[in-house]
Amino acid sequence: MKTTASFKKMKQQKEKIAMMTAYDAPSARLVEDADVDMILVGDSLGMVVLGYDSTIPVTLDDMIHHTKAVKRGAKNTFIVTDMPYLTYHGSFNETLVGAKRLMQEAGADALKLEGNGDIIDTIERLTLAGVPIVAHLGLTPQNVAVEGGYRVQAKDAKSAKQLLADAKAVEAAGAFALVLECVPEQVATQISEELTIPVIGIGAGAGCDGQVLVYHDVIGYGAGHVPSFVKQYVNITKPIEEAMKQYVQEVKAGTFPDKDHAFSLKENVIQELYGGALT
């Protein structure tokens, strides 16, 4: 399994990092079989699999539950788990308890924190405590209400310079990697070039050191909105819908289950029980 040092070496050797989300054991197994470098158990699971409108309702217990499942499905892949909304903005002791549960109880290999200057101290203290941290800048879904919705960040010179400063600050604080979301390609490329830690983009162009996408978006699973930066490699929703409809039709018609999908007694047992053959 790769380590934090492995990812730094990949950047040095200009080898791109492939990261993908997973929220359960079966999807984690498929992602691992595809030789993905890193799995993200994102709090995006709130919208993707739990039916919420945002990541805000996702709890620490939710993240622990899903990280455990992913760990069981992908035992040999580095797993990064999101610390959910407001679990790292109170006292550091509370933050440390949550981090400990995600690492020790759930089995995460690293934790991801969203924010900018307000999380620098937390990153530094968690890193000193032995917790590997991935920082998340640009569009930060946990702060979407403050940021005014899901929109591209750092679109002007002032905000682009601030983003670069924030990126350098999280690196200095000890983060071993950085996720940049919904940032213009030129800005993300500059940040990737100026940082020594890997920069993983999502909607941030090809100049990043790696890419991350949501599993369900990539395979077209579900009816949710697919962001414009996502490349959908297959759409499995329609075949699933067709299979469900066919199942219902066959049950209603009495054609499922047929003899190929049912168990039958041996002839001598039928004779003993019922005194003759059954039709």
Curated annotation (Swiss-Prot):
Catalyzes the reversible reaction in which hydroxymethyl group from 5,10-methylenetetrahydrofolate is transferred onto alpha-ketoisovalerate to form ketopantoate. It catalyses: 3-methyl-2-oxobutanoate + (6R)-5,10-methylene-5,6,7,8-tetrahydrofolate + H2O = 2-dehydropantoate + (6S)-5,6,7,8-tetrahydrofolate. Belongs to the PanB family. Transmembrane segments: none annotated. It comes from the Bacteria. Gene3D superfamilies: Phosphoenolpyruvate-binding domains. 3-methyl-2-oxobutanoate binds at D43, S44, D82, K112. Mg(2+) binds at D43, D82, E114. Its cofactor is Mg(2+). It is found in: Cytoplasm. Pfam families: Pantoate_transf. The active site is at E181 (proton acceptor). The gene is panB. Pathway: Cofactor biosynthesis; (R)-pantothenate biosynthesis; (R)-pantoate from 3-methyl-2-oxobutanoate: step 1/2. GO terms for biological process: pantothenate biosynthetic process. HAMAP family: PanB (MF_00156). Homodecamer; pentamer of dimers. SUPFAM superfamilies: Phosphoenolpyruvate/pyruvate domain. One of its GO terms (molecular function) is magnesium ion binding. This is 3-methyl-2-oxobutanoate hydroxymethyltransferase. Keywords: Cytoplasm, Magnesium, Metal-binding, Pantothenate biosynthesis, Transferase.
